[in-house]
Amino acid sequence: MDKVWWHTAWGLLCLLQLSLAQQQIDLNITCRYAGVFHVEKNGRYSISRTEAADLCEAFNTTLPTMAQMELALRKGFETCRYGFIEGHVVIPRIHPNAICAANNTGVYILLASNTSHYDTYCFNASAPLEEDCTSVTDLPNSFDGPVTITIVNRDGTRYSKKGEYRTHQEDIDASNIIDEDVSSGSTIEKSTPEGYILHTDLPTSQPTGDRDDAFFIGSTLATIATTPWVSAHTKQNQERTQWNPIHSNPEVLLQTTTRMTDIDRNSTSAHGENWTQEPQPPFNNHEYQDEEETPHATSTTWADPNSTTEEAATQKEKWFENEWQGKNPPTPSEDSHVTEGTTASAHNNHPSQRMTTQSQEDVSWTDFFDPISHPMGQGHQTESKGHSSGNQDSGVTTTSGPARRPQIPEWLIILASLLALALILAVCIAVNSRRRCGQKKKLVINSGNGTVEDRKPSELNGEASKSQEMVHLVNKEPTETPDQFMTADETRNLQSVDMKIGV
């Protein structure tokens, strides 16, 4: 019986922990630099665009602007986490790192959809201009709610309170759903109104650290910035050309995105566009350090009837796997989070390259991008393959993103846990009742003196004639009728009269 109650208590404890997990939020915050600080929720990318605004509002702050982020960067603020600001998703970087912002420095802008989940940055206008690491002890603008919100400061101090800060029901319902949207960039090309996207394969001229594998990222310059070009590339009469340099190492590729402004949009939209895709088998590289896989490579070709030069946009997305064979992409982390992004105030130095400075007003301009890793599993490879479409109006190559898989609702998980616990309790009660009902008891009638404990075992376990008696209780009902009772009474009366006469 004790074991049954122990299992019951253990099941209730597990159920309680499951319920509490749905009602706990940990907010890790950093020091403030010119009022800007970083907020991470539950140790992973789990904040939506709408929740980011609500969270900053709960801290009595706002989402920072790009100018405020650049000022914080100059004050020494840098992270390795993507976070929301006003209108963008960025990473502030001071020192180059191969796994942070594609080895770029400055405020690295990510071209990401608003449906993805990241961290967030907030701006406190009343904070000091320099670094401020005082502990945050309250969420002043939160309202009543059942959620336990814990603020974890940089020095490890923790402050908890009951409440809620989210104002959108979809953010509350999706609080425990891991974001599987890979629209953060590497395999999904966002349509850009500036012009066409021309992909060119180049050999890696300078491996970065131990990450000398092939990576892909598409970037654009948000402001006037220096843009490195490979010296082997030649441009004649500003015509769109296709060139394929020789790969010094077939396993080391670099994806370069070239954007060119279409001078004559009317002539382009007037003519048809032919799109072809040629799937190529993936290859493996066992030197890769992370848990990433190889998606299929696709080749897209566009032909213009009025142009003497054929444009070929070849997109080779090389993913490498070591031993990880899962079908779901890992959660974006500080070490591996890749997306098609934009570089603002970014600076990189590469040998054998010439630097060219151009602005957005130029007729044609090309960006050279550094590699960055992006985790993606095989489950998304088949979705992203062969779903490319041409937009004749804007002349932009767009690729549809992978659809999200349906998530199991939280209430269904809780209901299943309750049913399982009730079933376990019912089985335990049934087993215990069966044991009790099946027990046999012995009736011992002691015919001697003294209690049962005082008698010898031999007397109790001896013959039935000496130690036990069978007791039969017989309920005998009277069989005589009332008439018979009357006859007997009259007979007794007559006998009594005769005796009196005789006397």
Curated annotation (Swiss-Prot):
Post-translational modification: N-glycosylated.
UniProt superkingdom: Eukaryota
Organism annotation: Rattus norvegicus (Rat)
Region described as Stem: 228-410
CDD domains linked to this entry: Link_domain_CD44_like
Cited InterPro entries: C-type_lectin-like/link_sf, CD44_antigen, CD44_antigen-like, CTDL_fold, Link_dom
Gene name in the database record: Cd44
Region (Required for interaction with EZR, MSN and RDX and for co-localization to microvilli): 434-452
Modified residues (Phosphothreonine): 451
Transmembrane residue ranges: 411-431
Name of the featured protein: CD44 antigen
Extracellular domain ranges by topology: 22-410
